[in-house]
Amino acid sequence: MRPTMVAGNWKMNGLSGDAVHLTQAILHAGLEPMRPEVVIFPPFTLLHAVSQEAKSSALRWGGQNLFWEASGAYTGEISGAMLRDMGCRYVLIGHSERRQIFAESDAQIVQKIKAALLSGLIPVVCVGETEAERAQGLTDAVLRRQLEAVLPLLNLEASQPNLIIAYEPVWAIGTGLSASPEQAQAVHVFIRELAAAYSAQLARRLLLLYGGSVKGNNAAALFDQADIDGALVGGASLQAGEFIQICRAAESAGRGG
């Protein structure tokens, strides 16, 4: 049985006081450790504050991005080793905002995934289609293109996948819209089938998160779907009560283990 995960992407939000408040709220919520695994992705400037609060707990944290070089004259960038030095276990790669605003290509995303793996980080790789692509019936084609760049990086000699996939329909991010549980499930099945072409065993164990306006009032229905293993939460992760409600929905789904 695959574990569950709820990941909160704080994006470019919060100061140190906010980080302490949110982290403490999660820690004091009485969630059962690792069911689900709870991960937060704060801005780089808040990683230290989060790590100091969470270092003796089951709560995990990660970076929102990284550069593919280990060090050098890359002003404004951050390396995998730097994230590891801050206690990060995970890193987001290929978020739709990075793809759209910063024009990150599939090739660049592959470079970042490789750098993350070399640094001992677990990449949470984001894929998804825009509203225009969806309207043209291109969802499967877009996902196939994005994933055919990523899935060859699966370590076929490992017993567990070395990365996580987050499906984020771009049309649902920050809009209040969300794919129905059945729509999201269908896409997750498609992703798992693509992964099975590389390894049926790893595909069965591959953690697939849904990210698209996940909230406390729709999380349970999403987590009831067989191939939705958790959520990548955006705006709702900045509201302690809402985020904890999502975590409790994952906890109640009974799929941890």
Curated annotation (Swiss-Prot):
It is found in: Cytoplasm. The active site is at 95 (electrophile), 168 (proton acceptor). One of its GO terms (molecular function) is triose-phosphate isomerase activity. InterPro entries: Aldolase_TIM, TIM_sf, TrioseP_Isoase_bac/euk, Triosephosphate_isomerase, Triosephosphate_isomerase_AS. CDD domains: TIM (cd00311). Keywords: Cytoplasm, Gluconeogenesis, Glycolysis, Isomerase. Its EC number is 5.3.1.1. Pathway: Carbohydrate biosynthesis; gluconeogenesis; Carbohydrate degradation; glycolysis; D-glyceraldehyde 3-phosphate from glycerone phosphate: step 1/1. PANTHER family: TRIOSEPHOSPHATE ISOMERASE. Homodimer. Involved in the gluconeogenesis. Catalyzes stereospecifically the conversion of dihydroxyacetone phosphate (DHAP) to D-glyceraldehyde-3-phosphate (G3P). This is Triosephosphate isomerase. It comes from Acidithiobacillus ferrooxidans (strain ATCC 23270 / DSM 14882 / CIP 104768 / NCIMB 8455).
